[in-house]
Amino acid sequence: MTSGEGANSGADPEGFGSSAIDDAARLDAALPDIDWTVPPPGAAASVFRAPSGDLSMLTIGDPGDTRVVLVPGVTGSKEDFTLMLPGLAAAGYHVQTFDLAGQYESAAAGPHNLRPPRPHYDYDLFVRDLIAVLEAGQAPAHVLGYSFAASVAQLAYAERPELFASLTFLSAPPQPGQAFRGVSRIGRLSWLASGRVGAALMIWGIKCNFVKVSPGRLRFVNIRFASTRFESVRDIIALMKRTPDLRRELAASAIPKLVAVGEHDLWPLRLHSGFAREIGAQLAVYRAGHSPCETSPHQLNRDLLALFSRAG
């Protein structure tokens, strides 16, 4: 399914996304269960010294190629893009992804490392870290922000647009302000939960495997939670209740933009479609939930490569 500014939100049977059955969709339908702790062949692990501390990073591809930076969301990590990395590198891109401060193998990074120290993880911390990553390599780069990280990418773009060749928002909050208000079924009650309560509920739900991920994925998720700092999840949930409104700035931008979502995402498709229309972005929808990078990686790569080609 595709849409752009002024387009309708109906499925396009000739387009891509949930309506398309092609080689990418067939590859995704045959995905095996994997050990998510093992990096894909050719990927190198490293540590990036960011303003908030040491960030754990994976890199794949030729450093001379155009750069792609994939940024995971809350309770996530660089491993969420494991199935995407080889395909993007094979297509001729230098791909980097890193754990956010406080998350998984970047757990030691955080506001306590800033000068002066700060009591909470805030938008400025995550934006400074992302800008530092972008400044440290070839720019402009194609940037994908997953869920909460989409807001971070938007803020970084508003401050340093010259660092961005394109923007992709994967399963991103489609509304500014209290982002959880639009979540299907429970959104109208979300204002009752504090950051601490919201974080605890999110972690509990993921550990209980209500979305029925594979055994290998569930094992990795539990390993990751053992390292992730609860305070980082708590603070990010609180930040998502103050999602910035950058729709005007994004709509005025000439760089290619993509809103990529699963048809069973946390937020209803009509909100994602409206967000894409408001900012002049293409919309791609997959037969997936909140994590197309895990369940539809070949289709997502296909659409990213089409987006990148529009950047020249």
Protein language model regions, located:
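Gly/Ala-rich beta-loop-alpha elbow adjacent to hydrolase catalytic centers
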Residues: G145-A149, A153
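Active-site loop/oxyanion-hole signature of alpha/beta-hydrolase fold enzymes
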Residues: F48, Q96-L144
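Post-His helix in hydrolase/transferase enzymes
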Residues: E294-F308
